[in-house]
Swiss-Prot record:
Family statement: Belongs to the DeoC/FbaB aldolase family. DeoC type 1 subfamily.
Gene3D superfamilies: Aldolase class I
Pfam families reported for this sequence: DeoC
Lineage: Bacteria, Bacillati, Bacillota, Bacilli, Bacillales
EC number(s) given by UniProt: 4.1.2.4
UniProt keyword list: Cytoplasm, Lyase, Schiff base
InterPro entries in alphabetical order: Aldolase_TIM, DeoC, DeoC/FbaB/LacD_aldolase, DeoC_typeI
Matching HAMAP family: DeoC_type1
Protein name as annotated: Deoxyribose-phosphate aldolase
Cellular-component GO terms for this entry: cytoplasm
Source superkingdom: Bacteria
Catalytic activity as recorded in UniProt: 2-deoxy-D-ribose 5-phosphate = D-glyceraldehyde 3-phosphate + acetaldehyde
Main EC class the enzyme belongs to: lyase
Length: 221
C-alpha cells in the first residue's frame, strides 16, 4: 500500500504561519503526498511552492461551519481556483440539512461544483453532528449534486472520523465516489483501518509520522 498517495497533508490552524506552510509544502514534496490542504489565504503560496510537482493544492470552502451563503461559497471557490487550487473541500450546510431543507443543501453543493468545473470537489458532512439517517441523506445529496468525494469532518467540531462512518459512507455512495477520512487520524494503524473500511483519501496533519512510522505530535486533523 502506497500510503503517501492517500494523504492530504493538512494545515488548517488559524495561527498557521508562512514558515509552517512552507514546511508543509516541503514535506509534501519530499514524501510525494497526494495534496496539501490549506486555508484559502495560503493557496497561492502553496501553488507556487509545489509548481512542477505531482502534489495537488487543496483548499477549504465555507470552512469550518458550512453556514455561509450559496453565493459566497461559489465565489470563494472561484477565487481559490484563480489562486491555484486544484481540489476543494466544501462544508455542507449542516443547519439546512437538519432543518429538512434538502433543496438548499443540494443547491449549495451544486453551485460549488459548477464554480469548480473539472476541479475535484469533496463535501465535508461533519458526521459528528449528524444522525445515521442524516449521514446517508447527506451522502446521497452530495452525489446527486455532482460531488467527487464525501468527507467525514472539518476537524474543528465535536468529533472526527470513525471506521463505522467511513463504512456507512462507502456503502451509501458506492464504488465510484471517493470517501475521505479526516479528524483524529494520527497514526498508521488508524489510517489503515480507515482505508480498509472504504476510505480513498486521508486528511491529516500527521502525514509524515504516518508514512515514516514515527510517533506524532500533530493535531490529528
Amino acid at each position: 500500500m502506497n500510503m503517501n498517495k492517500y494523504i492530504d497533508h493538512t494545515l488548517l490552524k488559524p495561527d498557521a504561519t508562512q514558515e509552517m506552510i512552507d514546511k508543509l509544502c516541503q514535506e509534501a514534496r519530499e514524501h510525494d503526498f497526494m495534496s496539501v490542504c490549506v486555508n484559502p489565504y495560503w493557496v497561492k503560496r502553496s501553488a507556487e511552492l509545489l509548481a512542477g510537482s505531482d502534489v495537488k493544492v487543496c483548499t477549504v470552502i465555507g470552512f469550518p461551519l458550512g453556514a455561509s451563503t450559496i453565493e459566497s461559497k461559489a465565489a470563494e471557490t472561484r477565487d481559490a481556483i484563480a489562486n491555484g487550487a486544484t481540489e476543494v473541500d466544501m462544508v455542507l450546510n449542516v443547519g439546512a440539512l437538519k432543518s429538512g431543507d434538502l433543496e438548499t443543501v443540494k443547491k449549495d453543493i451544486a453551485a460549488v461544483k459548477q464554480a469548480a468545473g473539472d476541479i475535484l470537489l469533496k463535501v465535508i458532512l461533519e458526521t459528528c453532528l449528524l444522525t445515521e439517517e442524516e449521514k446517508v441523506v447527506a451522502c446521497k445529496l452530495s452525489v446527486e449534486a455532482g460531488a467527487d468525494y464525501v468527507k467525514t469532518s472539518t476537524g474543528f467540531s465535536t468529533g472526527g472520523a470513525t471506521v463505522e462512518d467511513i463504512a456507512l459512507m462507502r456503502k451509501t455512495v458506492g464504488p465510484n465516489v471517493g470517501v475521505k477520512a479526516s479528524g483524529g487520524v494520527r497514526d498508521g494503524e488508524t489510517a489503515v483501518a480507515m482505508i480498509e473500511a472504504g476510505a480513498s483519501r486521508i486528511g491529516t496533519s500527521s502525514g509524515v509520522s504516518i508514512v515514516t512510522g514515527a510517533k506524532t505530535t500533530g493535531s490529528g486533523y
